[in-house]
Amino acid sequence: MKYSYLLLILLLSNLYKEGFSQGQPDSIVLSATIYDESPIVTDFEIETYYNGVVEGIVQPDLGADGTPVYCCGDSPVTENGRIVVHNQSTFYSWFHSVPGVNVPIPYDLTLTRVGDSTYAYQSNSFFPIDGNGFDNSTVYPNEPHYLGHNFHFCMKIHYSFTYHGGEYFTFSGDDDVWVFFDDVLRIDIGGIHTAASRTVNMDDLGLTVGQSYPWDFFYCERHTSQSTLNIITNLNFTCSAYDACGVCDGHNDTCCMVNQCSESPINPCLIQACGPDNNYQCEFVDKICNTTNDKCLVESCEIGFGCLAIPKNCNDNDPCTTDHCDPAIGCYYDKFDNCDACNAVDTCITNDLCFPRECNPRGNPPCLINPINCTSTDPCIFSYCENGVCIPTYICTPTPSVTPTVTPTVTPTVTPTVTPTVTPTVTPTPTTTPTPSPTTVPPRPTPTPLPADPPPYDLEEGCLVCRDLDCEKTGKSCTYLENETIRLFECKGVGCCKYTPTCY
């Protein structure tokens, strides 16, 4: 009887385990936030770096905002005389949204069931955001790229688990990895290094059966040339709340990417705006040009040209002053001694707003002409005055991104001369344009506008053409301006028009 009773218990136990296993999903999706970092930022793609695991970069307790706390304030973490992390300011951008420094991107990390209640993610080539964020050459044409992949990003995941006994978590990969269980650091394999492994057994943490505990995972890929991420665990992950972007315990900082606000408009005078003020919807607002500290220049954004800077008009219309401009302070005026202001209304009439006339208090000549200065700081922009307003004109000859004399149709599979995936996408030097003698100064570009018809041979189908503008109705001609945003990169599809038609 006792023997039969034991067999019954064993049978029921096996049936329970089988039923529990059959009730498990085939996969678990962990919603994550990835912060794509520019390799120009100091902590990423460090030129002279220490190759090895470095512990102690972060403090043992999770920060109040749910992210790791940097160990050392404004001081760097070094190993063998080489910098591992520069300071708390550079470290902050690893797991916080910082406009202009990183790009938050939502990502789903899918773990697949490999046992009764065991799930795994295994990748020796973990590149989840290739072509996104700073790796998008159309949106960020000046960002360097390495070996065909986006190697520079950090990822954070926040979930909870209920402790039943026997749970474990194993990680293997590179580079920095910190995992907190119940807000305490249990896996610490920081630094730039080859794949390293750690395992945490929940039975060793003094947890209470049936109670839920937070689990926080932080991972960074900071250097070429490998990216490995392997996870094996039987933790039963749960999420208490999702943010507006669908990220567990998120902060809504990836919503703009969800709404595709990373797409760059053809109009260079519009920029993306997305945030809580507009319910995380993508909007385009006017670009504010702020490229110079010269107070003698006035900046404005012109469609087809982008930001332009022309000399400030310091004319105070006072014939008893001499007008000046200092780049540091702007306009200033010297008053004439013993000057009697004259009346220019009757004697010095302005017939052309580009050449305003004013009376001469010294009497000879009776009128002075102060032409409006429309000189542009860009050698490819010729600005002229029309009705008192400076009008910019593009005078440089656009250079086709594929030189016709190479006859690209003969060998279409030839490797392009610009390879962003091998070397950083620094502006390449054209090889087909004649180079002036080193002892001479290259001449100023001469106006050579492209014809209105036919359109440029490499203009994508669906892009605007001169016929759409109908410039002739206004008595003007039409030409095509090269789109500087994508001039140096291969680009296909919507929003990748290499030229923009404009009236002149």
Curated annotation (Swiss-Prot):
Query: Organism's domain of life?
Result: Eukaryota
Q: State what protein this is by name.
A: Protein psiD
Q: PANTHER family, from UniProt? A: PROTEIN PSIB-RELATED-RELATED, PROTEIN PSID
Q: Where is the signal peptide?
A: 1-21
Name the PROSITE patterns on file: PA14
InterPro entries named among the record's database cross-references: Fibro_Slime, PA14/GLEYA, PA14_dom, Prespore-cell_inducing_factor
Spell out where the chain is glycosylated. Answer: 87, 136, 236, 252, 290, 373, 483
Ranked from the top, the taxonomy reads: Eukaryota, Amoebozoa, Evosea, Eumycetozoa, Dictyostelia
Q: In what residue span(s) does the PA14 domain sit? A: 111-251
Subcellular location, principal: secreted
- Biased composition regions of type Pro residues, renumbered to the chain: 431-453
Give the gene that encodes this protein.
Answer: psiD
The family annotation for this protein states: Belongs to the prespore-cell-inducing factor family.
- Alphabetically ordered keywords of this record: Glycoprotein, Secreted, Signal
Per the record, its GO cellular-component terms are: extracellular region
Q: Where is this region: Disordered?
A: 417-453
Organism, as annotated? Dictyostelium discoideum
- Subcellular location as annotated: Secreted
Q: Where is the composition biased (Low complexity)?
A: 417-430
